[in-house]
């Protein structure tokens, strides 16, 4: 569990894979007065995850829209996206 999820309420997690390899994990956490999307990105040829962000939004609706657009883009690029 991420540090943010320990103090907020985790809304959802989306895990994208391509050719069986993890590409990214997106996690939305609601803090009541804001919502944060955390990202772990797994670059090709690297064992280590990169953690851009976090991305802070006014509410869960905005955070969900952001993740929805990211998921649609990942699917367009040939990734399989799963809810966790």
Q: Model-flagged regions — what are they?
A:
Residues 1-21, 46-49, 58, 84:
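Negatively charged, low-complexity tracts enriched in Asp/Glu with abundant Ser/Thr
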Residues 2, 9, 20-29, 64, ...:
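Short, mixed-charge low-complexity intrinsically disordered segments
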Residues 24-53:
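Short aromatic-glycine-(Arg/Gly/Cys) micro-motifs in beta-strand/loop hairpins
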Residues 47, 58-76:
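A short, charged, amphipathic alpha-helix used as a generic interaction element across diverse proteins
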């Amino acid at each position: 569990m991420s540090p943010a999820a320990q103090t907020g309420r985790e809304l959802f997690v989306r895990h994208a894979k391509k050719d069986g390899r993890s590409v990214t994990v997106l996690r939305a956490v609601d803090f009541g007065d804001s919502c944060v999307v955390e990202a772990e990105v797994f670059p090709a040829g690297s064992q280590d995850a990169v953690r851009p962000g976090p991305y802070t939004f006014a509410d869960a609706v905005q955070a969900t829209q952001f993740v929805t657009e990211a998921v649609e883009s990942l699917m367009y690029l040939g990734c399989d996206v799963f809810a966790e």
